């Protein structure tokens, strides 16, 4: 992992809403309206968090089409990951980039 990737992951997870989103998506995939309702935030705010989480590689999305309205829904699901962080790891990341 490089410094940029670690920063993206920590930035994406560095918020209570993002952690709640990850917990909900760890249980099951959700579409946006359903997820916003469960997390208790507006859809625009949810999209901001989802974008950060997706850019960090922590969630993925899929658009599905239906025969009845709404005809398309964007579903999100958590990607499995493990993060180990230590002071020595951070020191090594910085040293390798100098």
PLM region spans:
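Short, Lys/Arg-enriched N-terminal segment that forms or immediately precedes the first helix
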Residues: 1-10
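Short helix-coil-helix linker/hinge
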Residues: 11-17
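Short capping segments at the starts of secondary-structure elements
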Residues: 16, 27-34
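Pre-recognition alpha-helix immediately N-terminal to the DNA-recognition helix
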Residues: 19-23
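Alpha-helical residues within the helix-turn-helix
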Residues: 37, 54-55
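Key DNA-contact positions within bacterial/archaeal DNA-binding proteins
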Residues: 44
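Beta-hairpin "wing" of winged helix-turn-helix
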Residues: 56-70
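Conserved segment of winged-helix/HTH DNA-binding domains
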Residues: 67-98
């Amino acid at each position: 992992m490089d410094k940029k990737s670690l920063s993206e992951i920590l930035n994406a997870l560095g918020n209570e809403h993002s952690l709640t989103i990850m917990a909900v998506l760890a249980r099951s995939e959700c579409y946006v309206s359903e997820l916003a309702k469960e997390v208790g935030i507006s859809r625009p705010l949810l999209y901001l968090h989802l974008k950060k989480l997706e850019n960090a590689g922590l969630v993925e999305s899929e658009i599905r089409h239906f025969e009845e309205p709404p005809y398309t829904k964007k579903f999100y699901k958590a990607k499995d990951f493990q993060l180990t962080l230590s002071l020595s790891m951070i020191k090594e990341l910085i040293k390798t980039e100098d």
